[in-house]
């Protein structure tokens, strides 16, 4: 009698196939796409013109200016002062200064002849303008060094370089470490925190690997899209993407691994533990990611190019973080089992408080005096929020853009000391050529305008035949106040009103100051539009997840209050600790999107667990069990996210430092006060009614006991 053939290998062996394949796929993804994290800078641009509002008057002037440039150029302003004694006269060196830069004509990167050196009214400074190619890229520092060397040959003087080209070089230098330094600081910080949290060797490395794979995939996708001009990347977006992916992927991984550890204590089988962990946590992870991704996509409604750029890029990073967390991480957890926590050993126990002693005490405190807890927490948050209106978001002056000393800022300060405040950054007026005279008179009569002259055939403003292009002329108006000051912005408003009144001139006013003013106004309009959209998106997601109306409203209100409290504290710290006069116009909106979306994340983690426990044990017990079970992991996630955003501070730009502080402090405030005390205490005090009209909302009043 023949023996029947054996069927395919036991399902017990076949079930190993899926995690092994997933692991191999991610190893290939990481190996093949990993280099794109470093290559993203190749498709990034830090051109300041691309930060302008699409519909602003100053942006239309930028487009109109192109026709008046015989060559595409970027100006370098050379300023000479007395060497060793800045108060000494340097007019005797005027001819030598002119000769020093005249000799640069024809050198690599130099466009046309330099302007003659002109003295300041006080006779203590000279300035000349050298035009360079606008797309020098990595060659720009060398070209600037050549200009500096030539200008430095004037005896008895000290030469400094100011203007757009010098500022661009310093900006590129600030972003130089964004590929390696920022990522290294973030990963090392996260690894140290994970080692302290888990007291394990393998699991922190697995979580870091999951985050790195997510970053590699997201950078590769963004690189491909940016290379095809589908999305735009700059240094700020690049830095935020790295931090966002590392922080979000780690947070989601912490939630899943914490649930897996709980399930290992209940299931002897690692496959069953992973299935249970995924079943109970995937909804919260996906909902949390959706709030962040959709909140970021709301930035597409912005009229500011850099805001719109961050939206899709950040959303891609969040999606890749979720994909890695829900595929790579479960595969590795199945393969490692309890060994993932080595040298710790998850043990089976029936004690729900095991491993959560601290958070059991916090839950007991909330249970004993919920009204007192939420009242004190609310009072503290309101006290902090009271300072929020003092935060100025009108932009920062040039000398505050960088948090360290930079050559271009020092040169600009020297220029402002001896020449009209707006020297080197004139307001630019474009008007119909046949209305040149009345427009010129209107500009010169405007309070705050030091001088105004049409651009001539030589390509420079001054006496001579005005350059007419397509029936239009360009007028450069030098302002009395520094170009980055509030006084200069007020002058631009008056100048616009004056030239707009000239009949038939069709005049437009742009230039650096006008760009700053338009950006400030557009940022305010963006906040008015985007903030309610983000809140509505989050509210809808919470309603779908929690199947309630009142609880989502409560959660959105608490995270909004947390944002206002964070702004209040930030206003005090920025002014009295960092010495900033204000923030970039986009900082409050970025802070809102990140803090509100990420703040809701932690409340989603908490309240989805509370709902799960409440359906089994009642509302009151559900709150206590949910807070006890999630307190540790959510706090760890908050610390990780705060630390990763704090890593943005290694880039010496005020914008990123301000974002780093707002998000880091706000996340810690949310995890330690809002999510740990305020929300549980409010839910405990309100009781089952907070879950109306869902199933929990119809529980008996005993749920409040």
From Swiss-Prot:
Q: Name one GO cellular component term.
A: plasma membrane
Family (UniProt)? Belongs to the resistance-nodulation-cell division (RND) (TC 2.A.6) family. MmpL subfamily.
* Transmembrane annotation, as ranges: 16-36, 177-197, 202-222, 237-257, 281-301, 316-336, 373-393, 529-549, 554-574, 587-607, 627-647, 648-668
Pfam families for the chain: MMPL (PF03176)
Subcellular compartments: Cell membrane
What species does this protein belong to?
Streptomyces coelicolor (strain ATCC BAA-471 / A3(2) / M145)
By its UniProt entry, which PROSITE patterns does this protein fall under?
A: SSD
Principal location listed in the UniProt entry: membrane
**Record carries keyword Ubl conjugation:** no
What topology in the membrane does the UniProt record assign?
Multi-pass membrane protein
Q: Would you tell me the protein name for this molecule? A: Putative membrane protein SCO0839
For this UniProt record, give its keywords in alphabetical order, as a comma-separated list. Answer: Cell membrane, Membrane, Transmembrane, Transmembrane helix
In which domain of life is the source organism classified? Bacteria
């Amino acid at each position: 009698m023949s023996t029947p053939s054996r069927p395919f290998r036991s399902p017990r062996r076949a079930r190993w196939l899926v995690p092994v394949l997933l692991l191999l796929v991610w190893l290939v993804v990481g190996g093949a796409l990993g280099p794109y994290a470093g290559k993203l800078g190749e498709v990034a641009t830090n051109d300041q013109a691309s930060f302008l509002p699409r519909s602003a008057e100053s942006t239309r002037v930028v487009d109109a200016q192109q026709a008046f440039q015989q060559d595409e150029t970027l100006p370098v302003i050379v300023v000479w002062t007395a060497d060793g004694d800045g108060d000494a006269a340097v007019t005797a060196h005027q001819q030598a200064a002119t000769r020093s830069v005249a000799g640069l004509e024809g050198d690599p990167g130099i466009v046309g002849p330099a302007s003659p050196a002109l003295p300041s009214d006080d006779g203590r400074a000279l300035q000349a303008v050298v035009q360079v190619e606008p797309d020098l890229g990595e060659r720009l520092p060398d070209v600037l060094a050549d200009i500096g060397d030539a200008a430095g040959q004037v005896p008895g003087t000290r030469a400094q370089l100011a203007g757009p080209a010098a500022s661009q070089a310093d900006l590129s230098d600030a972003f130089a470490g964004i590929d390696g330094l920022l990522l290294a600081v973030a990963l090392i910080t996260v690894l140290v925190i994970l080692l302290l949290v888990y007291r394990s060797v393998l699991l922190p490395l697995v979580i870091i690997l999951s985050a790195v794979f997510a970053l590699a995939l997201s950078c590769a996708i963004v690189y491909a899209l940016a290379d095809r001009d589908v999305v735009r990347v700059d240094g700020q977006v690049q830095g935020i993407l790295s931090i966002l992916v590392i922080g979000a992927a780690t947070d989601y991984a912490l939630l899943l691994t914490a649930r897996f550890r709980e399930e290992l204590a209940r299931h002897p089988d690692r496959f069953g533990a992973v299935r249970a962990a995924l079943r109970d946590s995937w909804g919260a992870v996906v909902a949390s990611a959706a709030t962040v991704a959709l909140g970021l996509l709301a930035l597409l409604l912005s009229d500011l190019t850099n805001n719109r750029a961050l939206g899709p890029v950040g959303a891609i990073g969040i999606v890749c973080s979720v994909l890695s967390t829900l595929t790579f991480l479960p595969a590795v957890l199945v393969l490692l089992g309890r060994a993932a926590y080595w040298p710790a050993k998850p043990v089976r126990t029936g004690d729900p408080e095991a491993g959560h002693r601290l958070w059991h005490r916090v839950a007991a405190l909330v249970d004993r005096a919920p009204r007192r807890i939420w009242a004190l927490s609310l009072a503290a948050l309101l006290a902090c929020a009271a300072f929020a209106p003092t935060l100025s978001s009108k932009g920062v002056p040039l000398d505050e853009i960088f948090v360290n000393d930079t050559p271009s800022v020092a040169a600009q300060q020297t220029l402002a000391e001896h020449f009209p405040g707006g020297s080197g950054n004139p307001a630019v007026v474009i008007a119909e050529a046949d209305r040149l005279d009345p427009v010129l008179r209107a500009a010169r009569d405007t309070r705050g305008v030091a001088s105004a002259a049409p651009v001539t055939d030589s390509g420079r403003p001054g006496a001579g035949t005005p350059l007419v292009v397509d029936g239009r002329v360009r007028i450069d108006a030098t302002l009395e106040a520094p170009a980055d000051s509030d006084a200069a912005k007020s002058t631009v408003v008056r100048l616009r009103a004056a030239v707009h009144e000239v009949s038939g001139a069709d005049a437009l006013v742009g230039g650096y100051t006008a760009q700053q003013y338009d950006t400030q106004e557009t940022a305010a309009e963006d906040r008015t539009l985007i903030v309610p959209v983000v809140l509505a998106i989050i509210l809808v997601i919470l309603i779908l997840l929690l199947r309630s109306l009142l609880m989502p409203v409560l959660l959105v209100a608490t995270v909004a209050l947390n944002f206002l409290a964070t702004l209040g504290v930030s206003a005090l710290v920025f002014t009295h600790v960092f010495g900033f006069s204000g923030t970039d116009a986009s900082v409050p909106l970025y802070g809102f999107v990140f803090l509100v979306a990420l703040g809701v994340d932690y409340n989603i983690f908490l309240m989805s667990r509370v709902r799960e426990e409440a359906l089994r044990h009642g509302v009151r017990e559900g709150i206590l069990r949910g807070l006890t079970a999630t307190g540790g992991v959510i706090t760890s996630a908050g610390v990780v996210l705060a630390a990763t955003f704090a890593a943005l501070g290694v880039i010496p730009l005020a914008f990123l430092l301000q974002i780093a502080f707002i998000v880091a402090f706000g996340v810690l405030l949310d995890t330690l006060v809002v999510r740990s005390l305020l929300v549980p205490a409010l839910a405990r005090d309100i009781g089952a009614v907070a879950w109306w009209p869902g199933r929990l909302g119809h529980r008996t009043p005993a749920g409040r006991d």
